[in-house]
């Protein structure tokens, strides 16, 4: 048994904390909402994020971040991209030893183009930081909570951290593969949300399988181009954290990004869609970052750039599709 802390009480953090608790580890979750913390401790449920799921009886939660940080040397970071720096600053203030961080967030910081692992590293003092990894792949929290077979990848520059993640998470329904391409796994997990938004739009417009298949394929090409430019192994995008995550996020009604895009395709404004979602839609923020990166690095990303114009510049969805289909003739 190991002591593990999970920072974040959203759907994915809760599902992973439940797996760790099922695996007989001593798990303490941290959340800023006291009512959610009380619900986890008293009823062993988190109805807002994992409806109708009974959590393991030994799973505990706290709203005191110092208590959570001091509880364990292994810390799972499961908060939205926009909260990473502020949360890590709080962790850094109270940490008393070197910590191992495994994050499950999927995003890129706008303007700086930093990946999550880079943000975590920057916010921690060296004497409090042992290393960082990422857990990513085709995985809906709802299905993992139901113990449906799920397979993901863990990536880190540190072989020991990859092994730690594999050891603490793996069981009969949750399989973990290791990967040494930290850049590729993080980029794949972040950028697929852009394509999932676009896939939701095509479904909302009533287009069929042809359009979605083309969108996913050309979207993967965009992800690979930008990821390779940033130093990723292109083969990573053919694995679980690339095409695997892309498929599940573009085709499932569980996907927040697909749901948001679907509402946009049916005529909702971005503000209306986000308000109705009531949860973080990482693809919106990532579209902004990726559009800036494409321009900065000189990478051709027409789907991403069209989605950016739709989200932030008022481009009509039908006009956006028309523009993509009428682009200059080119080789695949």
UniProtKB/Swiss-Prot annotation:
Enzyme class: oxidoreductase
Subcellular location per the Swiss-Prot or TrEMBL entry: Cytoplasm
Xref: PROSITE patterns: NAD_G3PDH
GO cellular component, one term: cytosol
Entry's EC annotation: 1.1.1.94
Disulfide bridge positions per record: none
Residue sites binding NADPH per the record: 11-12, 32, 106, 141, 256, 280, 282
InterPro entries referenced in this protein's UniProt entry, alphabetically: 6-PGluconate_DH-like_C_sf, 6PGD_dom2, G3P_DH_NAD-dep, G3P_DH_NAD-dep_C, G3P_DH_NAD-dep_N, NAD(P)-bd_dom_sf
Pathway, per record: Membrane lipid metabolism; glycerophospholipid metabolism
GO molecular function, one term: glycerol-3-phosphate dehydrogenase [NAD(P)+] activity
Family recorded in the similarity comment: Belongs to the NAD-dependent glycerol-3-phosphate dehydrogenase family.
Name assigned to this protein: Glycerol-3-phosphate dehydrogenase [NAD(P)+]
Species the sequence originates in: Macrococcus caseolyticus (strain JCSC5402)
Lineage: Bacteria, Bacillati, Bacillota, Bacilli, Bacillales
